[in-house]
Amino acid sequence: RPEVVGVAAMHALEYDQAVTVARQVKRISPGTFVLAGGHAAAVYPAPLRKDAVDAICVDDGEEIVPALVTALEKKTPVTEVPGLLVAQGTDWVETTPRPERTSLDAVPLPARDLVDRWRSGYHCLLFRPAWAVETSRGCPFRCRFCSVWKLYGRSFRERSIGAVVEDFAATGPHVFVVDDLFFSPPARSLELARALVKRGIRKRWILAQSRSDVVARNPDLLEAWRPLARDFDIFFGLEAATNGALDRVAKDLDIGETLAAADAARAAGYGVTGNFLVDPDWREGDFSALWDFVEAHGFRRAGYTILTPLPGTPLFDDLAPALAGQPWFKYDMHHLLWEPRLGAERFFELYAETWRRSILHIGGDKSLFGWLRQVAPGQMAYITRILLRTQRMMKAGAYLREHREACRVKDLQRVPASVEA
């Protein structure tokens, strides 16, 4: 019987599963202390305040969890451990906040050997297995749909150059950099790239996430980082095709910077990908404008997600009355959470058509054969399964069936006009 079990809720759609797992643990081992944590748990812990959960970690877990385990071993009150919500009967007590953010250099590098037996299950896009690397944490920007800055208070922390170099050296050929704001700050990013080159690091593939304004204003970073991988993809938070739409989500950049960043990255030999937000309040002309923008500027590798008010964000707070009672499994960015302006049937017709214009559509400009030409022979079966599975995103009927099934749980409401504006 374990003394402590940790249950993760990294995303809002995992709240219910996390509670289910916690209850299973308690049913098997009633005396086990159950700690919930993860990004979603920390930024919006309310859905996890359930009978089977003993405490919720509401800050970085790297120092909180060892402190909690020590308190349990010494039988001292867990309410003395900073950064927790602790169940006490039917009430919850919030312990004192941590005095300062955890230094990333105080966090040990991942013990990846512990998951070697499952390594083949870690994959990203065409690349398998994949390794995750963190060089920084947090984001100082304040996008209305994003919970990262809310959790970390707009702070931004960096791991030291030497530690990052060692981490890159310890990983395999396919690396996903999990930073929310890669290439930032520019001076440190340039120093890091040079240190990695000096160490002789070169990967088969790297994927990093960044903002277009950071790249557009610092093209020298592209030159410095490009030698580090045979294929290097940059994922941009594209979000929208107009300045007005960017302003509505407080993106703090403009379309000109998006285009400048994409042009510079392509010219330097990078793959350009990213994501656009599809607003349920769109009219038909908004879909047409996005299609025209994608076609004109070559963003066919981008993805499209339905604008989703994630818990803990300003957008969630604004829409809370219309969202009341919606089940958490719908917060996957492919379900509707309020009644769309065009009605669900027409909305999904246009949403599916948007996906059909993407590179994932095997019936489009890039055929299935075209996809397989760039895949290693050993990966063909894997990528074929992935591509065939994604084809349901091109079918309005598949979305509509899921939508109607979900509405049996809770009907949608319209968003008040004042919130739409």
Where are these regions (language model features)?
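Structural recognition of alpha->loop->beta junctions
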Residues: 47-65, 225-234, 289-304
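Radical SAM enzyme core and accessory elements
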Residues: 31, 314-320, 324-326, 333-421
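Mobile, glycine-enriched helix-loop/loop "lid" segments at the mouths of ligand-binding/catalytic clefts
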Residues: 98-117, 316-334
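Flexible glycine/acidic-rich beta-alpha junction loops that bind and position SAM and/or redox cofactors
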Residues: 44-45, 141, 187, 244-249, ...
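Radical SAM [4Fe-4S] cluster-binding motif and immediate context
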Residues: 105, 109-276, 280, 289-292
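Glycine-rich beta-alpha loop elements in corrinoid/cobalamin-binding modules
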Residues: 2-103, 306-312
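Mobile, glycine- and charge-enriched loop segments
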Residues: 23, 34, 257-284, 382-383, ...
